[in-house]
Amino acid sequence: MLLILIRRLRLKFKYLNESYTVQPKTKEELQQIINETIEREGNECDLNFIDTSKIKDMSMLFWKIDKMDFNGDISKWDTSNVTNMAGLFWGCIRFNGDISKWDTSKVKKMSQMFYECKKFDQPLNDWDVSNVEDFSNMFEMCYAFDQPLNKWNLRNARDISAMFYDCANFNQDLNDWDTSNVKNFVSVLNKVPYTYALTNWDLSGTDPNHCKFIVSRRASPEMVSETKEAWKEQFEGKYKYSDILKFESNFVDR
């Protein structure tokens, strides 16, 4: 018992020493360090002493250790080798930390990354997301989020379904996004009070059945009318008229 106490005291001293760093080699090791630090120092703790440069998988990182109240500092994490951030902050309802300097250039999965992060509203426009393929449900139920994302390069995106589902305050212009490789647009802006037309979006990689319920009645009538007409024109001559009519009727979730 005494040896365990001494070990804990030594660990505490090391963690409090600003020059001290620890380098986990796996996600499981990282989760253990996060869990122990939060238990010891609370949900507002500074986790920048963790060298995450060897971590490739951060999927479901906080959800799996049940740290839903976490709102600490992870702004200096080295994410240059991470390829999977799916569900990273899933359910972290209080998290609103600055992660704008993260290196996301190798990430391929961001699905559900901020799922139900109800208070998150931090700038992400400088992120390199050019290799991300899956953005599905990324900001679902991020009620506070309303940051520009117009600089994002979606050249490799395949799935943006429900990306902003129920983002009650989101209203940023995304018309210049490269969506030429996107296969699934379903519910991308559903339950969002959106006002910007998306007439420049390229639908060449999808079909009308993957464009259901794009927006809801909360969107402005002008946005709905202009966008639906532009998209309908892209489908004409490529699909059966019945499919286009179905697309028109299902464009808005009623």
Residue ranges and their predicted role:
Residues L2-R254:
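Negatively charged
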